[in-house]
Design a protein with these regions (language model features):
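C-terminal motif of bacterial Sec signal peptides marking the signal peptidase cleavage site
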Residues: 4-7
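Long, non-globular segments of proteins
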Residues: 9, 78, 177-179
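N-terminal, intrinsically disordered, polar/charged segments of Gram-positive cell-envelope systems
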Residues: 12-61
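Intrinsically disordered, low-complexity segments enriched in Ser/Pro/Gly/Ala and basic residues
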Residues: 18-25, 30-33, 101, 117, ...
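Edge beta-strand at a domain terminus
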Residues: 36-48, 148-181
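Contiguous, well-ordered beta-strand patches that form the walls/edges
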Residues: 69-75, 88-161, 181
C-alpha cells in the first residue's frame, strides 16, 4: 500500500491494453483487446480490533501534489471512508498489538485498507502493519487550502504539501515547505 508522499498509487479502475496474437497457418495477426481491471473497495470487510473510520470533512476532496522534478501533478482522493481507494479503519482495541513479522497478521490484515487516526488537528494514515504514519495537517498557503505532509517520526517537520488546486500544486512544486509552519 502506498500513499501520497513520494507519489500515490491510484487504486481505481484502469484500462490496460493486452496484446494477443492469433496464429494462422502462414501469418501472425496481432490484435489488441482492452480489458478493465477494477480494484474494488470493500467497506464491509471486518478486521479484528478495527472499525470503519469516517474521515473528518476538512481532509475530504481531491488533492494534488507535484514533484519538483516533474511537470505533472499526482492526485489524492479522500472520501468519507477512503483514502486513494483504500478503505479507512480506526483501531477500537487498544490492547491489539500488530506485528509486521507475523505471518498470520500479514494474511489477516492484508487488503486494500489503511489505519487512520485524527489527533490534534492532523490526520495520521498508515498501512495496518506499517511502522510510520503519514501525517496530514490542514493549512493555507498564499490563499490556497492545502495539507502539510510529514512523517510520524517527526510530525512537526514538513516534508511536503498537497493542494486542492492542481495549478497551485504545479506552481509551488519546487517550494521548500519545510520552512512553512
Amino acid at each position: 500500500m502506498s500513499f501520497l508522499l513520494a507519489g500515490c498509487t491510484a487504486h481505481h479502475t484502469e484500462e490496460h491494453a493486452v496484446s494477443q496474437h492469433s496464429t494462422s497457418s502462414s501469418k501472425k495477426h496481432p490484435s489488441t483487446a482492452s480489458k478493465k481491471f477494477t480494484n474494488k473497495i470493500d467497506l464491509h470487510k471486518k478486521y479484528k480490533g478495527f472499525k470503519l473510520a469516517t474521515i473528518p470533512t476538512q481532509y475530504r476532496g481531491t488533492w494534488y501534489r507535484a514533484n519538483a522534478y516533474e511537470k505533472n501533478a499526482t492526485k489524492l482522493v479522500i472520501t468519507t471512508h477512503t483514502i486513494n481507494g483504500a478503505a479507512a479503519y480506526q483501531q477500537t482495541d487498544p490492547n491489539l498489538k500488530l506485528n509486521r513479522h507475523s505471518e498470520k497478521q500479514n494474511k489477516e490484515y492484508a487488503g486494500n485498507a489503511v489505519v487512520v487516526k485524527s489527533v490534534n488537528n492532523s490526520l495520521k494514515v498508515r498501512g495496518f502493519l506499517d511502522l510510520v504514519d503519514l501525517v496530514y495537517r490542514p493549512g493555507q498557503f498564499k490563499g490556497q487550502p492545502f495539507l502539510f505532509i510529514s512523517y510520524s517520526t517527526n510530525p512537526k517537520a514538513t516534508n511536503g504539501a498537497i493542494f486542492k488546486d492542481k495549478s497551485a500544486a504545479l506552481k509551488y512544486r519546487k517550494f521548500d515547505f519545510s520552512k512553512v509552519n
